[in-house]
């Protein structure tokens, strides 16, 4: 434990674990899914926002490619992720 400015800051290892998780395929798919859901709800209100629609399509493509990669490399992790996020299988 380190002290900085009167506050206790817990470990160096916590930051490392967070950084490791950010790079994983599962975290990236999770992040893209959250962005996709947010953009989809935005587009329901703003039907003529074509730049956001294009951004949504790009995110869908990125997520699809990551899911295809994960399905090819590790089918068990792919199935688990699909069920957790409630998204359809390709």
From Swiss-Prot:
InterPro entries: Ribosomal_uS15, Ribosomal_uS15_bac-type, uS15_NS1_RNA-bd_sf. GO terms for molecular function: structural constituent of ribosome. SMART domains: Ribosomal_S15. GO terms for cellular component: chloroplast; ribonucleoprotein complex; ribosome. Gene3D superfamilies: S15/NS1, RNA-binding. Its main location: plastid. It is found in: Plastid, Chloroplast. Keywords: Chloroplast, Plastid, Ribonucleoprotein, Ribosomal protein. It comes from the Eukaryota. GO terms for biological process: translation. Part of the 30S ribosomal subunit. Belongs to the universal ribosomal protein uS15 family. This is Small ribosomal subunit protein uS15c. It comes from Brachypodium distachyon.
